[in-house]
């Protein structure tokens, strides 16, 4: 240890210098440990990337899917505006179009209506997912029709709207999927 004693007005500065040396040594040690940890993490990441680790393959696939979905946002915006204009034209003079009805899609019924604000198709939602699709057992199925009416009476406070709302909540808009009730309704009318 470097010991130099400096006395000023009867004060001994040797103690302060010894503490400073300990502090400098601690700073050197912590800096060395930090760089060794960073080097180890970098080497580990390099090994993961060069060894075709499935974790990075999944992350790459997820990033591709996320970027693709973000690209769909502009398409969904355009389609939502078109469908809203179409709904506005359909609703001209028809107030009953804003009330829930059981719409027959062939293999299933869906309780749906047009939204009064956006003029987009709205259906009664099953929990936190997509719309209730009441499957039919035959071409004419009174029990499926009856259950659809039950949904209108008791579950009509939980709805999902085609377009941007559906894209934000479920990850798809319903317009670009086939078969889906949003795209099927667009093709039916």
UniProtKB/Swiss-Prot annotation:
Localization, UniProt: Virion membrane; Host endoplasmic reticulum membrane
Query: Membrane-spanning residues where?
Result: 29-49
Intrachain S-S bonds: none
Q: Which residues lie on this side of the membrane: Virion surface?
A: 50-189
Domain of life assignment: Viruses
Record note on modification: Contains two intramolecular disulfide bonds. They are created by the viral disulfide bond formation pathway, a poxvirus-specific pathway that operates on the cytoplasmic side of the MV membranes.
Sequence ranges on the Intravirion membrane side: 1-28
Topology of the protein relative to the lipid bilayer: Single-pass type III membrane protein
Record-level GO cellular component terms: host cell endoplasmic reticulum membrane; membrane; viral envelope; virion membrane
UniProt cross-references to InterPro entries, sorted A to Z:
Pox_LP_H2
Q: Name one GO biological process term.
A: fusion of virus membrane with host plasma membrane
- Record note on quaternary structure: Part of a stable entry-fusion complex (EFC) which is at least composed of proteins OPG143, OPG147, OPG155, OPG86, OPG94, OPG107, OPG104, and OPG099. Formation of the viral membrane is necessary for the assembly of the complex.
Task: Briefly state the protein's biological role.
Answer: Envelope protein part of the entry-fusion complex responsible for the virus membrane fusion with host cell membrane during virus entry. Also plays a role in cell-cell fusion (syncytium formation).
Similarity field: Belongs to the orthopoxvirus OPG107 family.
Q: What protein is this chain from?
A: Late protein H2
Question: Could you tell me which species this protein originates from?
Answer: Variola virus (isolate Human/India/Ind3/1967) (VARV)
Q: What is the lineage of its organism?
A: Viruses, Varidnaviria, Bamfordvirae, Nucleocytoviricota, Pokkesviricetes
Q: Could you tell me the gene encoding this protein?
A: OPG107
């Amino acid at each position: 240890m470097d010991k130099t004693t400096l006395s000023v007005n009867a004060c001994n500065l040797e103690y302060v210098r010894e503490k400073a040396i300990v502090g400098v040594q601690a700073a050197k040690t912590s800096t060395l440990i930090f760089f060794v940890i960073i080097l180890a993490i970098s080497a580990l990441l390099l090994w993961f990337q060069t060894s075709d680790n499935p974790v990075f393959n999944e992350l790459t696939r997820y990033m591709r899917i996320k970027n693709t979905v973000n690209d769909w946002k502009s398409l969904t915006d355009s389609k939502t505006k078109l469908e809203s204009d179409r709904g506005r034209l359909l609703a001209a003079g028809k107030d009953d179009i804003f009330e829930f009805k059981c719409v027959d899609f062939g293999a299933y019924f869906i309780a749906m209506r047009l939204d009064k604000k956006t003029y987009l198709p709205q259906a009664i939602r099953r929990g936190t997912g997509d719309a209730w699709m009441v499957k039919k057992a035959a071409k004419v199925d009174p029990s499926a029709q009856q259950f659809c009416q039950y949904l209108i009476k008791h579950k009509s406070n939980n709805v999902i709207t085609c377009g941007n709302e559906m894209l934000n909540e479920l990850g798809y808009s319903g317009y670009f999927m086939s078969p889906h009730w949003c795209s099927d309704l667009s093709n039916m009318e």
